[in-house]
Amino acid sequence: MANIKSQKKRILTNEKARLRNNAVKSELRTAIRAVNTAVESADKDAAATALVSASRKLDKAVSKGVLHKNNAANRKSAISKKVNAL
C-alpha cells in the first residue's frame, strides 16, 4: 500500500481508468465478434453495417487512449479484408 498521499490518489484514479478501459475493450470485442459472425454466415449487409460500427468503436478507443492508433488500424484492416472477401 502506498504511503504517499498523491500515490493513494493515483491508485483510485488508476482503478477508475482500468474499469473504463475494460468497458471500452469489451465493447470492441463484441463489435468485432459481430463482424466475424456476419462474415461466417455470409451476410453481406449485416457484415457491412457491423464493420462500420466496429470501425467507429475502434476509432473511439484510440481517441480515448485505450488502443494505439496502429493497433486499431491493423484490426480495422483485418476485419475489412474479411468483409471484402464476401
UniProtKB/Swiss-Prot annotation:
The keyword Secreted does not apply. One of its GO terms (molecular function) is structural constituent of ribosome. It comes from the Bacteria. Keywords: Ribonucleoprotein, Ribosomal protein, RNA-binding, rRNA-binding. It holds the Pfam family Ribosomal_S20p. One of its GO terms (cellular component) is cytosol. GO terms for biological process: translation. The keyword Ribonucleoprotein applies. PANTHER family: 30S RIBOSOMAL PROTEIN S20 (PTHR33398), SMALL RIBOSOMAL SUBUNIT PROTEIN BS20C (PTHR33398:SF1). Belongs to the bacterial ribosomal protein bS20 family. Binds directly to 16S ribosomal RNA. HAMAP family: Ribosomal_bS20. This is Small ribosomal subunit protein bS20. It comes from Pseudarthrobacter chlorophenolicus (strain ATCC 700700 / DSM 12829 / CIP 107037 / JCM 12360 / KCTC 9906 / NCIMB 13794 / A6) (Arthrobacter chlorophenolicus).
